[in-house]
Every structure is written in structure tokens, then in C-alpha cells.
């Protein structure tokens, strides 16, 4: 039976970009750009993106298109006799499930904060109270678990509708809204009084700062970001290659996806740094940037409730686009390996993902004594390199 395809090239590009565009584009990329010399770091990053990231995206698309299967079976069909490339499927499958253990939980945080900001829960709070709200959420396993389950059900529900009617149709709308929201938020931040120094900090090439931070460290950060920003290495993009028709150029599609991913990461900095500098609030990285620093920024901003709501809507779309894309990959693992129906694959994986996500939910409260990377670390720290 012929494999289902996307109904349009735009749909393929937006969904593949949605898989690549993750939370790390917002809470990691802008910070390391500012930390390692602004535009000087971006130049190094772009070099690695061209010589490492882009070729691997092309390779993943090629493997998917040649096999017409997910990473669960692609190398079984393509490998030379006697080789062991098929063993990579276990790494790919494990990588997708592990990534979703964290992403579904953090996606729930984004949805919760969207509703909290929409209701005006942060209005009038000082910095300490905003931080207390985040700590309170982490201490509530029922609240986090509930939103995690909602995210899992919503995103698998999209996948259950099929590639064209579900994944493509809904992700296209989310990605277009995401890009529009980014432009609106970036323009608003850049015109804030006092935001100019933030733009200078972010965009001005400062090779002296790169040397001061350590050339080796900056190069390693650029190398790592170029690899992980595109969600490569776990077969997440290979599944979309399996839907590409032979009339399309793989390199051209890979360039489009890479450019969109880079654009979103770059524009995130245009949102964050001018706003933080305008209100003299330190821009940090990681979850604290999103859930503590930026709510404080919005509290200082005229119309902050509206801008905060739009920001967390944008972040929810960024999280959901990745989750839906990876869920589509996970479902394909099941259907390719077992030949089961789409409905059965969805139902089984809903249960699997919810159970596997519980350690992340409980790792901040009931299981908080578990420190996987040493004292002071949490379960979420295992995933921060990627997201």
C-alpha cells in the first residue's frame, strides 16, 4: 500500500520545522548568544549548522524517503547484508520516548501558565511571589500530572485523526500562529523604551567577550546547539522524509526547515533581551527564564497581561508542535513494527507515555530526593541539553 503523503509542501516544511523548533530555541539559544559574544557566536553557530546540522537533516530525510518507513524499520530495509545499522532503531526509539517523558510535562507547564496569565493571576505580584508560584506548581504533583495528561491526550488526539486531516491541518495552523505571535512580540519588545541596550547585547559582535568566556567553551556551545536544535540523531525527522515525494529536493527541504528553526531561535532573543533590559531584570536561561523572569517582565509592562498571555500561547504552540511531531514518529514505530492499526497504536502509546512521564512529574515533589546529576539536580536536568 502506498504511504500517505502531505497534501502540500508548506505542510511538510511547517511540520518538520515544528519538530525541530523546541523550547531550547527560546530558553537556551538567546542566552548563549548573549553569553558568548552576540553576533560573533552566531557566526560560529551558523558554520556548524551548515557543516553538521544541515547534512544530517538531509541524511535523515534521505533514509526516510528511501525506506518509506520510520526509524524503527528504515535501516532493516536499507542496510547491507551482515551490517548492524538496524541496531540504531533501539537508540532512536528510546530517544523519542525519553524526550517525551519531559516534553509532555513541560508542555503542561506552558498550558497552565497560559491560563494563569490569561486570568491575571500574576498581576500585582513582586518577584518573590512570582517565583513562589513556580515553586508551588512544582510541589503539586496532581496539578502537574493533570496538565501532562491533558497534553498527551490532546496531541495524540491530533495524531489519531491521520496525517493530512490531523497532524498536517492542525500543525500548519499552530505554526503560522506561532510565527505571527513571534513577530508581534519581537516588534513590541524592540520598541520598548530602554530596550536598545538589550538589542546591542544580543546583536553586536563581541569577539573579546567570546575570548573572555573561553573560545573552546563557545565553540562547544555552538557545536552542541547546532546539533540539538534540529532534533537530529533520534530519527524524529526521518519519519517526515518517508512522506516526501520523489519530485522534491531533499537539500532544499532541509534548508527550509533549518532556516525556519534558526529564525525562531533568533527572534526569541529579540523578544527576551530588549524586554529584560528595559525593566532592568536579569535574563537567565532554562525554566527560570520562562516561568520566573518573564512573568516579572510582563508585570512591569503596560498591557503586560495581554503580552504575557500571547507569549505563553506562543510557547504552548512551540511545545505542542514538537510533541505532535514526535508522537507521529512514535505511532509509526508501532505500526511499522507490529502492523497494528492507528487506533491501537494511539491507545497503547497514550498509556505508555503517561506512565513514562510520571517520574518527571514526581521528581519535583514526592521523588525530589532523587538527584540524577548530583546534589541539587532534578529529573528535568537530564533533558535540558536537548530542549
What are these language model-derived features?
Residues 1-27, 56-61, 65-90, 245-249:
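Membrane-interface "cap" regions at the ends of multi-pass membrane proteins
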